[in-house]
Swiss-Prot record:
This is Rusticyanin. Residues 1-32 form the signal peptide. It holds the Pfam family Copper-bind. The keyword Electron transport applies. Residues 85-187 form the Plastocyanin-like domain. GO terms for cellular component: periplasmic space. SUPFAM superfamilies: Cupredoxins. InterPro entries: BlueCu_1, BlueCu_1_BS, Cu_oxidase_CS, Cupredoxin, Rusticyanin. It comes from Acidithiobacillus ferridurans. Induction: Expressed during growth on Fe(2+), sulfur and thiosulfate. The gene is rus. It comes from the Bacteria. It is found in: Periplasm.
Length: 187
């Protein structure tokens, strides 16, 4: 008989097998983008300072940005948050509201010591398959390095969105399917 715990365990084994298969055939990093020299390292105090540079204002589960240039700072699985998730302004997978025509500077930080992640922007909304095929509009970060030696990986990119609804998604197999995504409304 399956209990909720055994079903969850079996599901994660399936996701893990899918990720291993994807990596074996070269899909894991190809789906998330390439690991490149744009990734830098930061210590925990540096990460905390970066998180403070987000220019949004929180209201409920929404972070609203204003102005011609906005700075979104997103982290993967900050301490105290469930795996897998993104955090912006201490909110799990919040909706981001951004003015149309703004220049959006994104800093993405991976603080999850067990996994790499990606932060990609797409028009395709949920639900997402274990092996998501989302055709990113912005293949934002590529595949992040796994943090080690007390240092975390981060990278920056710039986006110039037009009005519409978008989603930020982690393309690592199984992550978006288990909730590692959020909505972006540009208006």
């Amino acid at each position: 008989m399956y209990t909720q715990n055994t079903m969850k365990k079996n599901w994660y084994v399936t996701v893990g097998a899918a990720a291993a298969l994807a990596a074996t055939v070269g899909m894991g990093t190809a789906m998330a983008g390439t690991l490149d020299s744009t990734w830098k390292e930061a210590t925990l105090p540096q990460v905390k300072a970066m998180l403070e540079k987000d220019t949004g204002k929180v209201s409920g589960d929404t972070v609203t940005y204003s102005g011609k240039t906005v700075h979104v700072v997103a982290a993967a699985v900050l301490p105290g948050f469930p795996f897998p998730s993104f955090e912006v302004h201490d909110k799990k997978n919040p909706t981001l509201e951004i003015p149309a025509g703004a220049t959006v500077d994104v800093t993405f930080i991976n603080t999850n010591k067990g996994f790499g992640h990606s932060f990609d922007i797409t028009k395709k909304g949920p639900p997402y398959a274990v092996m998501p095929v989302i055709d990113p509009i912005v293949a934002g970060t590529g595949f992040s390095p796994v943090p080690k030696d007390g240092k975390f990986g981060y990278t920056d990119f710039t986006w110039h969105p037009t009005a519409g609804t978008y989603y930020y998604v982690c393309q690592i197999p199984g992550h978006a399917a288990t909730g590692m995504f959020g909505k972006i409304i540009v208006k």
